[in-house]
């Protein structure tokens, strides 16, 4: 789906039918730049002021602890991907900056650990709420249109027909809403732990 949207944020992932624990998937390893994370939890004074953030709580010294993410355009695309995929577990540690082996090692943003996606019930939990309520850009509307046009056969053997329908309904709902979703208030908005 990441490729269909034209964002290519998910590393190469392949199905493995005969793994040691049975069927599953494997994903290309990405060496993460741990010195420059795009999502951070820290004392609020140490978080970059131009980042999207909110208060998590206070520490034992009564200092405010915040969670913030970069305004990087790839994260905005990832937030849209997660909304359509219904990602129930987008933690900060699942957002990496690392070399793209297919582009001579050029650094890029990667989204890993996408195991809790495509459920038919609403389950979106993410650390990437910084664009909640912001209008969709024309290119983002085009990404959602691409999802609506995916042939069922492209999903065959990967997700169920009910999950395919749910993906399309979420894409259509976002197009009709015209903006990024926000927390519903009906369930936890953040995965735990957030990083």
Model-assigned labels for residue ranges:
Residues 93-97:
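Hydrophobic residue at the +6 position relative to the catalytic HRD Asp in the kinase catalytic loop
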Residues 98-195:
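C-terminal catalytic region of ATP-dependent kinase domains
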Residues 1-52, 58, 80-88, 99, ...:
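Conserved ATP-binding subdomain of kinase catalytic cores across diverse folds
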Residues 72-77, 108:
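Alpha-helical scaffolds flanking conserved acidic
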Residues 85, 92, 116-117:
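Short, glycine/acidic-enriched loop or turn micro-motifs at the edges of active sites
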